Amino acid sequence: MKFSEMTYTRPDPEAVKATLAGLTERLKAARNYQEAREIFLSQQAESRHIHTAATLASVRHSIDTRDEYYDGEEKFWNNFFPELQAVQQEWTRAMLESPFRKEFAQEYGDILFTNAEMELKTFSPEIIPQLQQENELTQAYEKLLA
């Protein structure tokens, strides 16, 4: 499939947050590694879907920064990603506290947990407004360069 043929659809932010929160609760309640692994893979698929949509919007915006539709989409992502990161923190905590951590590390490597620990150290919900402002300033700078 060509990039130009890929369909962009803005996700419903509340549905995305609810899905991630639901997966987090399911991970916490998993009875065995196989169940936890299936939930993990579902979360990864959801994450890929969200990041693909964000990338489509970003690339299409960078092609023509005057395009009002994709300018609006870029603003949406600038505000949504920091909010999503707050919800993602709960997933990360659940992974770190999982009784199946050893099995996850054996299958996916210790880097999975090293990155998770770093993620928890580098984000706090209190900085969401600053992250959103940083994203907006970056977008304004990109427009100047274009």
Where are these regions (language model features)?
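A well-structured
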Residues: 2-146
